[in-house]
């Protein structure tokens, strides 16, 4: 049966890459790692006004149930091993969103002896959301950018 005949009968044709990318990007389960004021904006995104549920995004309390970590706030040296431990407990494939100036590069506390100058020194970061604190719209835009990145990523990497 030719492709044109299948499409006329109502079948949708796609590749496995596109199907898996669509499924992964449409059911992201983030885990919050809120450390400071950025976490309040992260809570706004989960509330009724922005409603992440419509994107298939449901916050999970456990790293073993989540595939996205949102790091929001100042990461200090004492908290860095805990961040790495939680990241290692997440199943593959996993992604990280760095939210706010403090998580991106230390922010206001950049020159403090006890602050990690960016969570990307501890875990690999996929999307950076700028701002101090970033708005809920900025985080939502960052999540949509992560969804686009997941859709473009090949399923079987060598």
Swiss-Prot record:
Cellular localization per UniProt: Cell inner membrane
Gene Ontology cellular component list: plasma membrane; respiratory chain complex I
Chain positions recorded as [4Fe-4S] cluster binding sites: 37-38, 102, 132
Membrane topology recorded in Swiss-Prot or TrEMBL: Peripheral membrane protein
GO biological process: aerobic respiration; electron transport coupled proton transport
Recorded catalytic activity of this chain's protein: a quinone + NADH + 5 H(+)(in) = a quinol + NAD(+) + 4 H(+)(out)
Pfam families, sorted: Oxidored_q6
Gene3D superfamilies per record: 3.40.50.12280
Note on cofactor: Binds 1 [4Fe-4S] cluster.
Cofactor(s) listed: [4Fe-4S] cluster
GO molecular function, one term: NADH:ubiquinone reductase (non-electrogenic) activity
Source species, domain of life: Bacteria
Enzyme Commission identifier(s): 7.1.1.-
UniProt KW keywords: 4Fe-4S, Cell inner membrane, Cell membrane, Iron, Iron-sulfur, Membrane, Metal-binding, NAD, Quinone, Translocase, Transport, Ubiquinone
Function as written in the Swiss-Prot or TrEMBL entry: NDH-1 shuttles electrons from NADH, via FMN and iron-sulfur (Fe-S) centers, to quinones in the respiratory chain. Couples the redox reaction to proton translocation (for every two electrons transferred, four hydrogen ions are translocated across the cytoplasmic membrane), and thus conserves the redox energy in a proton gradient.
Family to which this protein belongs: Belongs to the complex I 20 kDa subunit family.
Assembly and oligomerization: NDH-1 is composed of 14 different subunits. Subunits NuoB, C, D, E, F, and G constitute the peripheral sector of the complex.
Record-given protein name: NADH-quinone oxidoreductase subunit B
Chain's gene name: nuoB
